[in-house]
Structure formats: structure tokens, C-alpha cells
UniProtKB/Swiss-Prot annotation:
Belongs to the WFIKKN family. Pfam families: Ig_3, Kunitz_BPTI, WAP. One of its GO terms (biological process) is skeletal system development. Residues 413-544 form the NTR domain. The second BPTI/Kunitz inhibitor domain is able to inhibit trypsin. It has however no activity toward chymotrypsin, elastase, plasmin, pancreatic kallikrein, lung tryptase, plasma kallikrein, thrombin, urokinase or tissue plasminogen activator. Keywords: Disulfide bond, Glycoprotein, Immunoglobulin domain, Metalloenzyme inhibitor, Metalloprotease inhibitor, Protease inhibitor, Repeat, Secreted, Serine protease inhibitor, Signal. Protease-inhibitor that contains multiple distinct protease inhibitor domains. Probably has serine protease- and metalloprotease-inhibitor activity. The keyword Glycoprotein applies. Coiled coil: none annotated. One of its GO terms (molecular function) is transforming growth factor beta binding. This is WAP, Kazal, immunoglobulin, Kunitz and NTR domain-containing protein 1. Residues 29-82 form the WAP domain.
Length: 552
């Protein structure tokens, strides 16, 4: 029969095309590991490859964690490489990560196309352990710092954290002007423009969570979804995670929402001045209408911890909101059916309304700047750092975590109040301390850096006057600022206490190998007029020379 003969060349052509397409998926020599975003999901082309900057012709023109991909302009640009969930299938004889070293900080070995490669870690522990890094930023814990170092191809190390000793200066402008006043150039911790509000979408819908923050320098934004696992996935800008994309402006967009996507999405914004974390609740609803529940006893019962043993696995891909006593608010839990009914709420708002009594803890709210232009200096409490910090309020649409002074903030919020430290007892009185010291200065603290591991730190002092200087030549050199090393400091109750007060201090200490040093026996007191006058009189009368003669 002559009719079937054309099928043979068609079949051959199909096999050839199939083999060609499979060959194109193999990595080219010298190419970077991973895939272009559109190779994983064509729906996210615009979100991931909308930039037409950073042109390239091959992967070698990009950073090690990037691919050279076609952009929307018809050219090619460097884009963060994507990896499918679980990575590509590899044969049983694939290479292992044994004896394979990843020199980059924050990277781990992974297998890609049968070869060991280094990938930046993207999951970190949920427990906070705030870490100040050499790039001037504060990280939630050290894992976050290592992950950021890998992403940027840097080496970061831990440095002492800085204290904010007073309100940063600002320039509000004269009252008669109508131009928008600009805050001063001092670093400012991150603050939200608007308060996070719960969102609810139906299955298959799209949700957009915008972590719109201010701060100086501009804060870096990451996202993570809260879970009951030990580690959370860190989601960074300009990257795709399944059906979730984080845009370059820190906006999280979730496509084709499913029931299991419901939960608390936490935005973390950080800069050199501080750290902010804000929860954005997202509920995903089934399109089928559900019967309204009795908001009375049944709702109250569902707020209680579920102590009843349930037979069988949880409902597949279904989560409900329940009150979490540890968080003090509602969170998602896998839906368990006991006696034919799943305990919990379909939305975050319904759970909060039924289970959370009272207005809630204002100190747990993130600082909100607001969208207006009437700049005012305010204070907000950070539950992460457990201290009050300054921020700039625009004059409208804020929240209750907004105080006019540091004192009112500390009175309203749970600032750790350890038993009061005993007053630092001086080993010697003023005259004897002056004679035993190598220097005596009057100055104002501008910065204090703690080094708890070394039981020390550094204090930077703006000099008002040099009363005595035997070894450093401060007056001769015209020194305006002095860096003093703090030795043997117990930062729980530091002596001498260099962390209190904004006024001038009288500081006396030793000079060791050309470095000014303060220890527990050093003299540090407020620079009252009477005290400074007494020191000047002792020096003019050469009291120290007389004292040395008597001791000899």
C-alpha cells in the first residue's frame, strides 16, 4: 500500500526535532549553572526579565549566580539564574559533593547536570540572633549575613554594633515655608509608608504584597513565609520561587494562588541604621461558598489549642487559621478533621476577630511613616531589638507604635529592665585619679562600639578641652576627635558607664602603646563646671608633683 510511506520521513523528522530540542537544553561549555526564568515558567517572563540593562552575549559576561537571558527588548541581559524545585534528575552515578569545597562564604555544594556546583544557601533559621556586619547592615542572624555575602560575591564578617545615643539631627525648615522639609542626612532605621493589611484571594487568583519602606540609606528587602519548620526560605528581589515572584522594588506577587499558599508572609527591611520585620497575612478562599459559622461558643472553642488526637492524615493542601499562643496572633495550621469537622478559620481576619481580645500590643506593630509630608521626629519600639529607636513620622496614617519621646516609648513598651546596676565605685577620688592618669579630657561621646566577646569596645569622643596629656600630643596635633579603647567591660553593667548621658564628660585614663585606654578603674564623670574648675586648679598648683614627693 503506497499511502503509509510518507509516515516514515515524518517520524524521522519528529525524532530529529525532539533530539535537537533535548540537545539545546544541555549546558554549553563555560555556561553558568541554572536556567533562564522563562525556561521554567513563561508566565513570569516580564517579571523576571523586564530590565534591558546590563547587556551580555554569554554567561561569562555575568556574575557566577546569573545567566545571560533574552529580555523583553529583544536583546540579552544578566538575570539571576533559576533552579527547578528539587533540581534536575541525575543518574545514580552522578558526582557527589564529597571533597568538593565551596570557597564563597554562604555557599553549599549541590549537584547540577551530574556535576557538583556551589549554590548560595536560600534557607535560614527562624531564631533571631542579630548580627552587625562589615557592610554596615544589621542581619536577623548570621545565616542571613552569609547568604547575602554569597549573593553579592563578597566576604562579610561580624563587627560590633553601634549605639544610637541621641536623636539624629534633622532640618525641618522654617514654619513659614511651604516646601517639603527634608530630614537630615543622618542614618534612619527602616519604616513602612503604610500599615500591613490582611488580604484574601480566591483559588487561582493573584495577590500582591508591597513592603513599601523608607530609610536612610535605602533599606534592602527580603521576604519569607512563616512555617512550622526549623528554617524559612529567604525570597529575594528579582527572583522566582514556584508561583511567587519578588520584584526589584521588593513587591511579592503570588500567581495562581492555591489553598496551601495561605499564611503569614514576613517582609524584612534592613539598612545600616536598623532592622524591620512586618507580617502580611494572606488568606486563600475556595470559590464554593461556605456556611457561616456561629460566632459564639464554636468560635471561642476553635481558638483553644487542639489537644484532641485525630485519626488519619491532614486534609491534602488545606490549611486553616488558628490562634498561636506563642505569637499572640493567628497563624496557619494544616487542617485536621476530628469528628468530621476541621477546626479553624478560613481567613486571618475571622481568626483575629474571634480569638484576639483587646486592641492588641501596640509595641509589636512595625513603625509606619505614612504618606504625608509633615515630617516630625518620633520614637518607635522594636520588638526584635527590644529597644526604642527614632524614626520620622509624616504626620498621618501611622499606628499606635508612635511616641513623642524616648522616655514615653520606654514607659509604654517592654524594654528589658534588669536589676539596676550599682553605681560605679571609683578606686580613687578626683585628685588621685588625675595624678595616676596619663590624660584627662572633656568631651562628648559620638559613638560606642561593643565587643562583648573580647569584653571590650571602642568609644569615639569629640574633644571639648584637653586638660592633661602626657603621651599623645593632642593639643600639639590639634586633635578634634579621640578614639578610646574600652578594656574589661561588662556590658550588662559597664564601668565606667560610657553609654549614658548626652552631655560633656570628664574622662581620665591610661595610654598604652600610644592608644588611649579606659578600664574599670578609670575616672568618667559628668563635666560640671565645678569639677572642671577643680581639675584646672590642681594642675596649676602642680598637686601631682607634690603627691609624688610624699609617696617617694
Amino acid at each position: 500500500m503506497p499511502a503509509p510511506q510518507p509516515l516514515l520521513p515524518l517520524l524521522f523528522a519528529f525524532v530529529l526535532i525532539h533530539l535537537t530540542s533535548e540537545t539545546n537544553l544541555l549546558p554549553e561549555p563555560g555556561s553558568h549553572p541554572g536556567m533562564c526564568p522563562n525556561q521554567l515558567s513563561p508566565h513570569l517572563w516580564v517579571d523576571a526579565q523586564s530590565t534591558c540593562e546590563r547587556e551580555c552575549t554569554r554567561d561569562q559576561d555575568c556574575a557566577a549566580s546569573e545567566k545571560c537571558c533574552t529580555n523583553v527588548c529583544g536583546l540579552q541581559s544578566c538575570v539571576a539564574a533559576r533552579f527547578p524545585s528539587g533540581g534536575p534528575a541525575t543518574p545514580e552515578t552522578a558526582a557527589s559533593c564529597e571533597d568538593f569545597q565551596c570557597p564563597q562564604q554562604g555557599s553549599n555544594c549541590d549537584i547540577w547536570d551530574g556535576q557538583p556546583v556551589c549554590r548560595c544557601r536560600d534557607r535560614c533559621e527562624k531564631e533571631p540572633s542579630f548580627t552587625c556586619a562589615s557592610d554596615g547592615l544589621t542581619y536577623y542572624n548570621r545565616c542571613y549575613m552569609d547568604a547575602e555575602a554569597c549573593l553579592r560575591g563578597l566576604h562579610l564578617h561580624v563587627v560590633p554594633c553601634k549605639h544610637i545615643l541621641s536623636w539624629p539631627p534633622s532640618s525641618p525648615g522654617p514654619p513659614e515655608t511651604t516646601a517639603r522639609p527634608t530630614p537630615g542626612a543622618a542614618p534612619m532605621p527602616p519604616a513602612l509608608y503604610n500599615s500591613p493589611s490582611p488580604q484574601a484571594v480566591h483559588v487561582g487568583g493573584t495577590a500582591s504584597l508591597h513592603c513599601d519602606v523608607s530609610g536612610r540609606p535605602p533599606p534592602a528587602v527580603t521576604w519569607e513565609k512563616q512555617s512550622h519548620q526549623r528554617e524559612n526560605l529567604i525570597m529575594r528581589p528579582d527572583q522566582m520561587y514556584g508561583n511567587v515572584v519578588v520584584t526589584s522594588i521588593g513587591q511579592l506577587v503570588l500567581y495562581n494562588a492555591q489553598l496551601e499558599d495561605a499564611g503569614l508572609y514576613t517582609c524584612t527591611a534592613r539598612n545600616a541604621a536598623g532592622l524591620l520585620r512586618a507580617d502580611f497575612p494572606l488568606s486563600v478562599l475556595q470559590r464554593a461558598t461556605t456556611q457561616d459559622r456561629d460566632p459564639g461558643v464554636l468560635a471561642l472553642a476553635e481558638c483553644q489549642p487542639d489537644t484532641q488526637a485525630c485519626v488519619g492524615p491532614p486534609t491534602p493542601h488545606h490549611v486553616l487559621w488558628r490562634f498561636d499562643p506563642q505569637r499572640g496572633s493567628c497563624m496557619t495550621f494544616p487542617a485536621l478533621k476530628c469528628d468530621g469537622a476541621a477546626r479553624g478559620f478560613e481567613t486571618y481576619e475571622a481568626c483575629q476577630q474571634a480569638c484576639v481580645r483587646g486592641p492588641g500590643d501596640v509595641c509589636a506593630l512595625p513603625p509606619v511613616q505614612g504618606p504625608c509630608q509633615g515630617w516630625e521626629p518620633r520614637w518607635a519600639y522594636s520588638p526584635l531589638l527590644q529597644q526604642c529607636h527614632p524614626f520620622i513620622y509624616s504626620g498621618c496614617e501611622g499606628n499606635s507604635n508612635n511616641f513623642e519621646s524616648r522616655e514615653s516609648c520606654e514607659d509604654a513598651c517592654p524594654v528589658p529592665r534588669t536589676p539596676p546596676c550599682r553605681a560605679c565605685r571609683l578606686k580613687s577620688k578626683l585628685a588621685l585619679s588625675l595624678c595616676r592618669s596619663d590624660f584627662a579630657i572633656v568631651g562628648r561621646l559620638t559613638e560606642v562600639l561593643e565587643e562583648p566577646e573580647a569584653a571590650g569596645g571602642i568609644a569615639r569622643v569629640a574633644l571639648d578641652d584637653v586638660l592633661k596629656d602626657d603621651k599623645m600630643g593632642l593639643k600639639f596635633l590639634g586633635t578634634k576627635y579621640l578614639e578610646v579603647t574600652l578594656s574589661g567591660m561588662d556590658w550588662a553593667c559597664p564601668c565606667p558607664n560610657v553609654t549614658v548621658g548626652d552631655g560633656p564628660l570628664v574622662i581620665m585614663g591610661e595610654v598604652r602603646e600610644g592608644v588611649a585606654v579606659l578600664d574599670a578603674n578609670s575616672y568618667v564623670r559628668a563635666a560640671s563646671e565645678k569639677r572642671v574648675k577643680k581639675i584646672v586648679e590642681l594642675l596649676e598648683k602642680k598637686a601631682c608633683e607634690l603627691l609624688n614627693r610624699f609617696q617617694d
